[in-house]
Amino acid sequence: MSDIAERVKKIVIDHLGVDAEKVSEGASFIDDLGADSLDTVELVMAFEEEFGVEIPDDAADSILTVGDAVKFIEKAQA
Amino acid sequence: MGMRRVVITGTGMVSPLGCGTEASWSRLIAGGNAARRVTEFEVEDLPAKIACRIPFGDGSDGTYNADDWMEPKEQRKVDPFIVYAMAAADMALADAGWKPESDEDQVATGVLIGSGIGGLEGIVEGGYTLRDKGPRRLSPFFIPGRLINLASGQVSIRHKLRGPNHSVVTACSTGAHAIGDASRLIALGDADVMVAGGTESPICRISLAGFAACKALSTQHNDNPEKASRPYDADRDGFVMGEGAGIVILEELEHAKARGAKIYAEVVGYGLSGDAFHITAPSEDGDGAYRCMQMALKRAGLTAADIDYINAHGTSTMADTIELGAVERLVGDSASKISMSSTKSAIGHLLGAAGAVEAIFSALAIRDNIAPPTLNLDNPSVETKIDLVPHVAREREINVALSNSFGFGGTNASLVLRRYNGD
């Protein structure tokens, strides 16, 4: 797993209080990890803070899984 | 439709003397004193450096461990006043043995929990975030974690209580108003059971600084915290801030009897009044307090001669004398048979939670026939025939108790509780 993926995973574990093994690349924040709509807003804020990127609202709406977040950040930092 | 009768069938408490009603009560009766110097944050530049903090610990031996009451990831989203309320509500519902599962029971059970100042510290931090990092860094939980009625909201969500969902904000009268208003909802048939009380987590720099700025706090006993809260004593100089939550389960009498619930006491009287005088000081003639107590007694169908114990508002400020004068006017010749104490001498002033915690102490005074003490009453500044229960608890017959709460803005609330004898 890439450095970005590891850091994303850690944020998800910390914020949602879920077990590490559940946080797979395809895991959906809402459907698989118990997040609600406010949790996802906070997760996006945490990604912005951690990686120094800006995630506009329309982009945030399409970040539904751990993998989506990793892909967006990799692209933003490329 | 006549007014239905309302009884207390459960209690829960997080107080500076302990996590749990019995832990707090037994320490209170034993003369425990929770005041200490604040060490959790910088107090050097504050005029008041002391407070009555709840006993943080691992949850054993009456200590409070927030993780026992809310998952850490959820705690992060709310102010501590909400966690205290969740803890006290869990305890109270368990104590009452009330766990509504049917549709009918869930919609018949409501919540009415208030707070005086809510998530003040979190609001300050949110302000810093907005100023220093901008609006995009403000958490989506900033608002729902600070709003006062979210204590009621969170409790209702956890326990699926779908009846009236309400809240009270009347400064230091909040807890008493919450219990009084919730009793009314049951009496009028809007609910059969109410989870009611007050919660407060005010011990932070802005609150200590703010209350000191309006000259409400004790500042002369910083080196001897246990001596600072001294209601009616000549050396009192302000209140000592406390924190915690008190929650009762209120229940319609027949509903409680039908399920064989334990009954602590009946809520027989409730009075409310306004001073219309000053933003922080009570009216000097004590008329607001007098009318409030009188209304509560009238509602109860009792007279002053029926009162055995009064849990005074008694904050350890100059206002103690005004309250005492109002009580003396109310009770007249019955003064010599009444015991009146201020439990704020032991736990400090819990602001919005005070009235609820003190109503529970009043119910326990009836249950156990014992008046808790007024600590530090070494040199009374007043002369009265009323027994102010100095230093040590007093065993005596208590069938009727009156609990007073008065708040900034001139808002007054009195509750009258009576022993329930099965009739």
UniProtKB/Swiss-Prot annotation, chain A:
The keyword Lipid biosynthesis applies. Carrier of the growing fatty acid chain in fatty acid biosynthesis. GO terms for cellular component: cytosol; membrane. Pfam families: PP-binding. Transmembrane segments: none annotated. SUPFAM superfamilies: ACP-like. The keyword Phosphoprotein applies. The gene is acpP. PROSITE patterns: CARRIER, PHOSPHOPANTETHEINE. Belongs to the acyl carrier protein (ACP) family. It is found in: Cytoplasm. Pathway: Lipid metabolism; fatty acid biosynthesis. The modification O-(pantetheine 4'-phosphoryl)serine is found at residue 37. 4'-phosphopantetheine is transferred from CoA to a specific serine of apo-ACP by AcpS. This modification is essential for activity because fatty acids are bound in thioester linkage to the sulfhydryl of the prosthetic group. Residues 2-77 form the Carrier domain. GO terms for molecular function: acyl binding; acyl carrier activity. InterPro entries: ACP, ACP-like_sf, PP-bd_ACP, Ppantetheine_attach_site. It comes from Rhizobium meliloti (strain 1021) (Ensifer meliloti). The lineage of its organism: Bacteria, Pseudomonadati, Pseudomonadota, Alphaproteobacteria, Hyphomicrobiales. This is Acyl carrier protein AcpP. Keywords: Cytoplasm, Fatty acid biosynthesis, Fatty acid metabolism, Lipid biosynthesis, Lipid metabolism, Phosphopantetheine, Phosphoprotein. GO terms for biological process: lipid A biosynthetic process.
